[in-house]
Amino acid sequence: MGDSDDFYWNWNNEAVCNWIEQLGFPHKEAFEDYHILGKDIDLLSSNDLRDMGIESVGHRIDILSAIQSMKKQQKDKLQQENKDQELKNIEESYKKLEEKTEHLSDDNVSLEKRVEYLETENTKLVKTLNSLNSEFLQLLRKIAINVKEGRQLTTENSSDTSSMTHPVQPSPSVLGSFDLEVNDSLTNAEKNRKLNVNLTYNEVLCSMLQRYRIDPNTWMSYDLLINYDDKEHAIPMDVKPLQLFRNLQKRGKSPSFVLSRRSC
């Protein structure tokens, strides 16, 4: 019958003759002479077999019956193979689907972890921004308070300096220079409790220049002197002029400040 894996429509003449011989019919030569192929078997009729020289009606019926039985067996076999192949394809498709589902599940888990991480980082960022915002607002309040206090201090210092001075008078003690004498009264100094006696030499000098509308940037062109006992005295730059002024007042010296323009 030839290769058992081949179906009858693929048989050559030799395979057909071998199949007839295996059935036990003495008609192999007739099938050889007419060169019957597998694709011809399905078309044979009783008259065709008679024309091929098979006179026995019983043999013709048996051959046709064997052909139908063989066709049914191979058809069932083909259907089973198709079912097996379909089942195999379904199993492979299901396996691929499971793999894709597992992959998507892993991706979903990974995505959830990323979302959770981003939510955590976002929460941290919001807390950090809120903290920075709070610190920034506190800093702005401190700056506003410092600016306000600085303005008050400037006003108080100007008021203190003003309370210690009288209108500027020319000083005849320094010839060839532009001098300003600043008198102070003991009573006004004692009454003014806001007086800042810790101002440095340069601070007092610049304050005096500002008060009399002289550019403070020209302070190097002026000296701050103090007059007592009818004599002008130089004030060392490391001495705090207002403290010196107070000390002289306490000793009853009646001191006064003098602005003296240096000679070129």
Swiss-Prot record:
Annotated region Leucine-zipper: the residues are: 111-139
A GO molecular function term, named singly, is:
protein serine/threonine kinase activator activity
Q: Where is the SAM domain?
A: 11-73
Q: Which domain of life is it from?
A: Eukaryota
Q: Which SUPFAM superfamilies match?
A: SAM/Pointed domain
Q: Which ranges carry the Ras-associating domain?
A: 176-264
Its keywords, alphabetically, are: Meiosis, Stress response
Which PANTHER family does the UniProt entry name for this protein?
Answer: STERILE ALPHA MOTIF DOMAIN-CONTAINING PROTEIN 15
Put simply, this protein is called Sexual differentiation protein ste4
Phylogenetic classification of the source organism: Eukaryota, Fungi, Dikarya, Ascomycota, Taphrinomycotina
What gene is behind this protein?
Answer: ste4
